[in-house]
């Protein structure tokens, strides 16, 4: 009797923020397409956003560890965090011994460290992907024992110790590229504007955007505005709207199919997390970027400046963000459609439609070697 072929087992981990979760989820879903040969586990914290996203996909199995970010000050919290690190590493060792993964992939966030370190202890091949110009602390540490490192930005290489580094771009879902060869029509009467403050939302961006776009709509500008407020900021932002039933000004707590909104948008106002930038460029959308001012090593501003250099984006620092500044920037673009066309065309410099397939192929190759 012919024996059933053993399935390949993969551990994928990345957590807490969308910038870490979505690359991991994209890879996990791609691997799970071959259900006959692959079994995919996602390791994260059940209390965090990754659990809510992963549980929507029955083909993925979620394994939870109770671990989170490191306190930056010496305190009792730091002492307790150390115990959590030990316990989470032991739990990860248990998971690895139980399921025997062929390889492990981490996409950033403190939640990834116990699992990746456990993999190192048990001599499992490890690959990491980092999205930003300045890699996070976990990526810097894990790069010392990872077999492969995948990056979005060339500039990030200098921070990492691994000898096997490749610039792949960010792994984003294929939906962002579907029909991307269709050019946006910037000569249309009504321009579609999308405002999004990242997966967590951003109240400062919400406040300024609502004030500016209410004024522009009242002045007769032909715009359709969609604002992703973030769940926790939705009610507070809704209170700022003078006309809550205006079909041309829509607030949403969260947009599950953000690719559809980006494809329709002629301009996006957003934070500059690396994953958001990849999604923006994949859909050829001109952008006004407002970096999160408290990002580690100011990496969001560095990300935004990379896009600004090639004229596909305008970077406005949050400290300089006022209604007048944002209004002037938007009106200048509305009145200069050719500028929007050029910005849209220049996004191709950063658009990497093969990134997901390349990363998955390298990861599978790592497990086979």
Give residue spans per PLM region.
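Conserved nucleotide-sugar phosphate-binding/catalytic loop shared by glycosyltransferases and other
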Residues: 6-17, 34-84, 231-233, 317-319
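C-terminal alpha-helical cap of glycosyltransferases
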Residues: 352-369
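Donor-nucleotide binding loops and adjacent catalytic segments primarily
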Residues: 48, 53-58, 177-268, 301-305, ...
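A short, well-ordered alpha-helix in the C-terminal region of glycosyltransferases
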Residues: 339-353
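A short, glycine/small-residue-rich beta-strand->loop->alpha-helix junction that serves as a flexible
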Residues: 14-25, 203
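Active-site-proximal region of nucleotide-activated glycan assembly enzymes
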Residues: 38-41, 60-61, 120-181
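An amphipathic, basic-hydrophobic alpha-helix
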Residues: 72-103, 121
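Acidic donor-binding loop of glycosyltransferase active sites
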Residues: 101-103, 263-278, 285-286
């Amino acid at each position: 009797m012919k024996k059933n072929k053993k399935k390949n087992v993969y551990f994928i981990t990345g957590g807490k923020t969308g910038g870490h979760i979505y690359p991991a989820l994209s890879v996990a879903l791609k691997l799970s397409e071959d259900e006959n040969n692959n079994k995919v586990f996602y390791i994260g914290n059940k209390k965090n956003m990754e659990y809510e996203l992963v549980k929507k996909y029955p083909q993925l199995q979620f394994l939870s560890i109770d671990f989170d970010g490191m306190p930056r000050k010496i305190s009792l919290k730091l002492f307790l965090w150390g115990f959590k690190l030990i316990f989470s590493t032991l739990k990860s060792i248990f998971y690895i011994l139980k399921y025997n993964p062929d390889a492990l992939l981490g996409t950033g966030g403190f939640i990834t460290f116990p699992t990746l370190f456990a993999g190192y202890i048990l001599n499992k091949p490890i690959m990491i992907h980092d999205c930003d110009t300045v890699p996070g602390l976990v990526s810097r540490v894990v790069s010392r024992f990872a077999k492969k490192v995948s990056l979005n930005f060339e500039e990030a290489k200098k921070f990492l110790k691994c000898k096997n580094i490749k610039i792949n771009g960010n792994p984003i879902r294929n939906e962002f590229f579907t029909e991307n060869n269709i050019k946006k029509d910037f000569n249309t009467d009504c321009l579609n504007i999308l405002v999004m403050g990242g997966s967590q939302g951003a109240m400062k961006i919400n406040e300024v955007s609502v004030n500016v776009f209410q004024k522009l709509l009242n002045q007769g500008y032909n715009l359709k505005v969609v604002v992703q407020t973030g769940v926790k900021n939705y009610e507070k932002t809704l209170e700022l709207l003078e006309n809550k039933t205006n079909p041309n000004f829509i607030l949403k707590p969260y947009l599950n199919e953000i690719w559809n909104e980006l494809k329709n948008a002629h301009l996006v106002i957003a934070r500059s997390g690396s994953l958001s930038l990849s999604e923006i460029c994949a859909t050829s959308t001109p952008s006004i970027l407002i970096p999160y001012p408290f990002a580690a090593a100011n990496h969001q501003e560095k990300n935004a400046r990379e896009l600004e250099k090639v004229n596909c984006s305008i970077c406005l620092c949050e400290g300089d963000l006022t209604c007048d500044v944002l209004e002037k920037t938007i009106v200048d673009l509305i009145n200069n459609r050719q500028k929007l066309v050029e910005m849209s065309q220049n996004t191709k410099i950063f658009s990497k439609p093969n990134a997901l397939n390349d990363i998955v192929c390298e990861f599978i190759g790592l497990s086979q070697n």
